[in-house]
Amino acid sequence: MLIHQSAKCENTTPKWAGKWHLNDQDTVFGGAMEVFNCDDTTCDFKLESWYDLHICDVEGKIKISADKAEYNGKKYQYDRETDTEYFIPVGILFQMESEYKMNLHFINADSFSAFCGIQATLEGIWIRQ
């Protein structure tokens, strides 16, 4: 009975969950991400990527739809000339390419500056470890 139950648990493990790495072979450019607390429609994630001393640092909840997921947020902006505060929509698209390969892209141009330092990026192929 225990063997059957443990096999059942293994089959229900979400395909998104795990530890992922961007360019694992390079210490100047790379990244690490953990995806956890997954259910059928969402997962939590923490991500850090870097290029030299510039970093991207993002954490939140992705919404899953088949082999794609999105993280959506808002970037605070302040216009000094008009003394106006406002928010710009930003986000990241996660696309599962295989069981061990995920492609990340910014949803729009404003997303880069919301999450990353001058030369860092989180875009690219992430490999499950």
Predicted regions and their residues:
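N-terminal glycine/threonine-rich, aromatic-flanked beta-hairpin/loop signature
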Residues: 26-66, 103-120
